[in-house]
């Protein structure tokens, strides 16, 4: 598998414009990225632009704080699927995890998994920069129990992004059959290679073209 096919080509900034989405989807077609990862408002346009392409549309749920109710997250998933999303990246209820309310964390994830079942792949963002190692392990274990397809490090909107150490811990926790996505601060081919070596099977990056081409990102960011 090429590196491009492991990348979710990402544009999640709040000021993203239609022109930028059109560029993003054009680049996804050209380079063969796994997906474009966009905010829900851009799912329909992205799906239209990628009709017939190998790249699919990924969107974000309960993003970036994870503090919506399970019911709201489930509605977001259904709406996104209706608009053409094939993958959804949801943020867990981080406060509930901190409170050791594992039942709520699991119910929250299950609501998304159930809403997406058979229609969209689910990635669970645990926001590693806010968690202890014990919490990272517990979050991954709950996500697997709830039926996720992937666990993911970060939103890119908090205090830190992906590290090889966190990827290795997540991979060790979920085993070989669940995907692990590194996201947040992954900007170069060398960054990607470190993440893959640690156990990542998907990369979230706004610098997808620079990573594949070997050029420096025009404007580095966290996404």
From Swiss-Prot:
EC assignment: the record states 4.1.2.4
Q: Give the active-site positions.
A: 89 (proton donor/acceptor), 152 (schiff-base intermediate with acetaldehyde), 181 (proton donor/acceptor)
Reaction catalysis annotation: 2-deoxy-D-ribose 5-phosphate = D-glyceraldehyde 3-phosphate + acetaldehyde
Q: Pfam families, per this entry?
A: DeoC (PF01791)
Entry coiled-coil feature ranges: none
Q: What class of enzyme is it?
A: lyase
For this chain's UniProt record, which GO biological process terms are given?
2-deoxyribose 1-phosphate catabolic process; carbohydrate catabolic process; deoxyribonucleotide catabolic process
What metabolic or biological pathway is this protein involved in? Carbohydrate degradation; 2-deoxy-D-ribose 1-phosphate degradation; D-glyceraldehyde 3-phosphate and acetaldehyde from 2-deoxy-alpha-D-ribose 1-phosphate: step 2/2
Give the record's family classification. Belongs to the DeoC/FbaB aldolase family. DeoC type 1 subfamily.
Query: In its UniProt entry, what is this protein called?
Result: Deoxyribose-phosphate aldolase
């Amino acid at each position: 598998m090429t590196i491009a096919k492991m990348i979710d080509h990402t544009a999640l900034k709040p000021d993203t414009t239609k022109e930028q989405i059109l560029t993003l989807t054009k680049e996804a077609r050209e380079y063969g990225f796994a997906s474009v990862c966009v905010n829900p408002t851009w799912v329909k346009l992205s799906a239209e632009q990628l009709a017939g392409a190998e790249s699919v549309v990924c969107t974000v749920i309960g993003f970036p704080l994870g503090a919506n109710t399970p019911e709201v997250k489930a509605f977001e998933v259904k709406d996104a699927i209706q608009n053409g999303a094939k993958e959804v990246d949801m943020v867990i209820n981080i406060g509930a995890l901190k409170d050791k309310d594992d039942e709520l964390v699991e119910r929250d994830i299950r609501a998304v998994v159930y809403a997406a079942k058979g229609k969209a792949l689910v990635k669970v963002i645990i926001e590693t920069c806010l968690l202890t190692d014990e919490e990272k392990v517990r979050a991954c274990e709950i996500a697997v129990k709830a039926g996720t397809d992937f666990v993911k490090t970060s939103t890119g909107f908090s205090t830190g992004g992906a590290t090889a150490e966190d990827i290795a811990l997540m991979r060790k926790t979920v085993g070989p059959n669940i995907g692990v996505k590194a996201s947040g601060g992954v900007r170069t081919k060398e960054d990607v290679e470190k993440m893959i070596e640690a156990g990542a099977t998907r990369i979230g990056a706004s610098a997808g073209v620079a990573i594949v081409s070997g050029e420096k990102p025009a404007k580095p960011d966290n996404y």
